[in-house]
Amino acid sequence: RVGVAIAHNPFGPYIPEATPLEGVGGIDPCIFVDDDGQAYLVMPGITITKMNDDWLSVSTDPADRHRVEEVPTKGLVEGPYLFKHNGKYYMTFPWARDVEEVLAYCMADNIFGPYKFMGVFFEEHANKCWTNHHSIIEFKGQTYLFYHHNDYSPAFDKNRSVCADSIFFEPDGSIRMVKPSLRGIGVTQANKEIQIDRYSEISQSGDSIAYLDTTNYFAGWKTVFYEKNAWAQYN
């Protein structure tokens, strides 16, 4: 079930409502607020439902509820995330395409569709970790993908660390493939030391990322070059 907690300050304290939302079942809800101020609840499945003005209930009018049909029929387990960019609606979602999850998406001109399945924009993690649950935020003109991974806990992927990478779009609005970079986001001042594990791009072979201390994963990473002419680029 999905519950609601209310606070008068973003930092709380939050007071939970006595009962969960009526007519809503499942996990990993997403709230999307359109340009006109109308809020929608997005749930795995994938369904989009108008929220009432109190934000404590959803509309029971069938016309205010839409199931996105233009998605894979299997492997939709959790966490859809809806966002808007340049007037287009992007329904993004984790998809267990084979075994592990990728991130895929659909696009539409209207919130209730019809949507067009666009494919994958974030591949499975190399170590087969199921940690693609994500959100997408635009800040100061740049769009960012937030997700989590088990870089600090490879033996137990439930101890997940937050990751962020930039998202870029093609001229037709489609999302370019996002590759985890370990670079992080933001701009490094020219007079600051650069952490060399944070690369924008690396050569296809001859280098890798390793832990500074294999007994203490929180010590950070290093870039290891083991072939001539291997390189790492930081933008």
Which positions does each model-derived feature cover?
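Carbohydrate-active catalytic/glycan-binding domains of CAZyme proteins
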Residues: 1-234
